[in-house]
Amino acid sequence: MVNSLFSRLSREKERLATVFLATLAFGLIAHGYGFLNFTVSHDSMNEFWLFQQMGYYSGTAAQWKIALGRFLSPVYQLLFRGETVAPWFSGMLALCWIALAAWGTAALFDIRERWLLIFTCGIFTVNLSVTALTASYLHDLDADMFAVLAAVLAALFWKRGTWHQLLTIPLLVVTLGIYQSMLSVYISLVIFLCILRLIQADQAKSVFLDGLRAIGLMAAGGIVYFLLSKVVCSLLGLDLTTQENGIANMLTGSNGILSLLTATFLSWVTLFITEAPRVNFLFHALLFLAALVLLFLLFSIKELPTPNKLLIALLLVLLPLGMNVSAFLNNGEVHLLMLYAAWLVYLLLLLLCRRVAKPGMTVFCCILIGLILFSNVRFSNELYTRKDQERQATLSLMTRVTQQLEQTEGYIPGQTEVAILGTSDFQSHPGYRQTYETVGAVFPSPISTEDFYGAYFSTVLQTPIRLCDSTRREELKAQAADLPAFPDKGCTAWIDGTLVLKLS
């Protein structure tokens, strides 16, 4: 078995080298700034340490993940990254998993052409979901990319069939147990492969049955995952939370099936129309026209049986649902982190170009996708630069705030109860206007809300402070309404034994 593995790796040497080098190059150009600077902010501030108490959940970051149904996320972190957010190491781990996922995808579709390998790596690495993760959710970046890898491997083992397909079940449990939305990667790749097989004139019945087999394996993985989630929560004395996009929130709304389907398709379509950077809309519009031409050429193939054409059409209609299944399961609510699979539509276009074998069309699509990747690289670096500027500005502000507290007579660090009211009033710079639309980047400071002060003092300032709870803070806001805002004189006051500082 070992000899067989080394023999396989030897045959894969060139493809592996291309994939890893391309992923590393794309990753460093697009996200290197985020990996090399301490731009930890938003949720990655509140979950910097795996076992730290959180501001918006009465428990640790690990318990929060488990309550969301991501019970394998803490396990992954302890096995690979450790208990803290380490930007450079997390980034390198993420690129490693992305490279392996791209290689697995290449094996799935038998991609050996160097140009297509490079584009596959670019699509997996330089997309807005990875950018949002790096900018504001760095604590989840490498774990989520590991979930992508598990989803790709699940599709590979499904394709192999025989006893290997049983490995699809635990791999999907891993995917769901780290980040549920990455299940869409598995669904998308299965649909891609079914479409390509139908184009190659494989029997529609055979493809249909294989598709049902993929659904059955996914259902089995989902059942095992759900049962394990309940068991883990029961053993740890936790309840599955209905907050955010956790498992307990699935299909709990009052929306009907038709309403959910509409929301799912619309959120997928609008992703390519309204998501920043806005220039990508033009490229997406041209790619849509190219896709129509490709489909016309494919459906014009006389040798292609009618059942195949009908099944291809059905799969294309279902593709947005598969890529955005999280929206359907989450009552129509979805954000950028949950839409990683949507960007794989670029890969499908290139695979169709390879099948049609029209050089002009292939070059046209490559140019457009290349422009999208370039636009994403530029956008990600703008966002990381903005985050770094805000990091430094916030550090300066909070250093002065800490000094103001320490100069107040009677204040004892770590013992006196403190209430900091409001957050920084940094102005949004018009040059960064589109970056504020990205999930997690809408706030002009690493301290997104008042619930993040505890994390900031412990993570960045490493200064002891005893902050009051949110209920007490809201009570004090009314009593401190007439206080001037920092740094004006009189911005601090003692109210019922609590030192209050009004920031804004």
Description of each model-found segment:
Residues 2-63, 67, 74-101, 107-122, ...:
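Intrinsically disordered, polar/acidic, low-complexity terminal segments
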Residues 41-43, 48-50, 56-85, 211, ...:
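Membrane-lumen/periplasm interface segments of multi-pass, membrane-embedded glycan/lipid transferases
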Residues 66, 70, 114-159, 177-178, ...:
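Membrane-interface micro-motifs in multi-pass membrane enzymes
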Residues 122-123, 303-328, 370-371:
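Transmembrane alpha-helix segments characteristic
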Residues 151-165, 197-204:
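Membrane-interface transmembrane helices that cradle and orient dolichyl/undecaprenyl
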Residues 165-166, 288, 354-379:
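Signature aromatic-anchored transmembrane alpha helix within multi-pass, membrane-resident enzymes
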Residues 165-180, 185-186, 191:
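Membrane-interface alpha helices of multi-pass inner-membrane proteins
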Residues 186-219:
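Perimembrane helix-loop-helix junctions
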